[in-house]
Amino acid sequence: MSSALLLAPGDLIEKAKRELEQRSIAPLLREKNSTEAKSKLKEDGEKKNKSEKEENKIHDDRRVESQESEGSGSADCQRGAGSRGADCATSTGGGDGGAGARTGIGGGGVGRVDSRSGGRGGQGAASDGKGVGKSKTGADRVANDGATRDVGTSEVSSSGITSGGLQGRGGLVAKSSECGGEPLDRTGGCSGNSKTEGEEAKVGGGDRRIGGLATQGIADFVKKKIGVEVQVFSKGMSNFFTVDKSLLKRGGLGREDILHQSDIVKEIRASDKKVKIIPLSTVKRMIAEFGGTEEDEIKAVQTQSSSIRYISNRMEDVSRAKAMFTAPTGDEGWKEVAKAATQRPNIMAYVHEGEGDGLKELLHLIDHI
């Protein structure tokens, strides 16, 4: 019996994976990149460029506003000098949070404050006496005994918070030593990770059912019965599956496997009650837990005399294909493969146009070629 190759759509091959494995047919699938991946990459690049342009425009607008505001403050300061005893002084902060402008009462006039931030978020206004200064943002600052607070804004002093600076218009970015330097969110917590320990466990797969059988001999017995490989139990698994003793005896397993299974059950009940013991009393129960097919059906499949040993949706396999099966599909590259295959004079082509996905018809074709 020769080894032949069958062409079929990729999504149909994926659906038939278990049945193909039972028939010892190897799938040869085209890599999922090409058109779909290139389209997504192009779309992501366009979005990134658009985002960068918008961000640059925002920065430019803010820089222009800042320059206009500084120029206006300087002009006002010059116009007010010398009238009614007004005194105007400007100071630029430097280093880490340098102090801002200082002002006092000159005669009967009230000084104007022009505060410029310097270093990493350094800004503020202070007064030797009692006075009212007006900042560029329009918020009134009340200075008294060297302590400064903002009136009508949401900026307040907080212990354990290092100065961050102003972001946008009045948006304070603060970092806390308790959060390991991560930014604080508006609820007062660390914005870097807001999940609880239980949520983290679920995300990490802690709630997934992981289990196994007592010995490799029992695992081989289960595979023979339902055609599914089940791993051997080890520490850290959350479930231990026990196969009924009568099933094991009828399957020809020795006394050693049965006793080892009993010993693990006793050990779990005595010391590790977190592990769940799940009994498998029948073959149908095994299928319910692990999937698969009953032994008689597996034997019937294995005795089928099909010459097909490979199934593919790749263009490079068209030249050596014996037959082609096609059906409505979501495989984007399949149209070109099918077109190339039909140009060969000696290839057998089968088309599914009825209801359903064509899986049953594909397997029927495989078993009769």
UniProtKB/Swiss-Prot annotation:
Pfam families named among the record's database cross-references: Orbi_VP6
Primary localization: virion
UniProt-listed InterPro entries: Orbi_VP6 (IPR001399)
Tagged with keyword Amino-acid biosynthesis: no
Keywords: Capsid protein, Intermediate capsid protein, Virion
Disordered, as annotated region: 20-208
Any one cellular-component term (Gene Ontology): viral intermediate capsid
Biased composition (Basic and acidic residues): 29-66, 196-208
Gly residues composition bias: residue spans: 92-111, 162-171
Keyword Plastid: no
Subcellular location: Virion
Protein origin, superkingdom: Viruses
Listed GO MF terms: structural molecule activity
Family (UniProt): Belongs to the orbivirus VP6 family.
Protein's recorded name: Protein VP6
Species assigned in the record: African horse sickness virus 3 (AHSV-3)
Lineage: Viruses, Riboviria, Orthornavirae, Duplornaviricota, Resentoviricetes
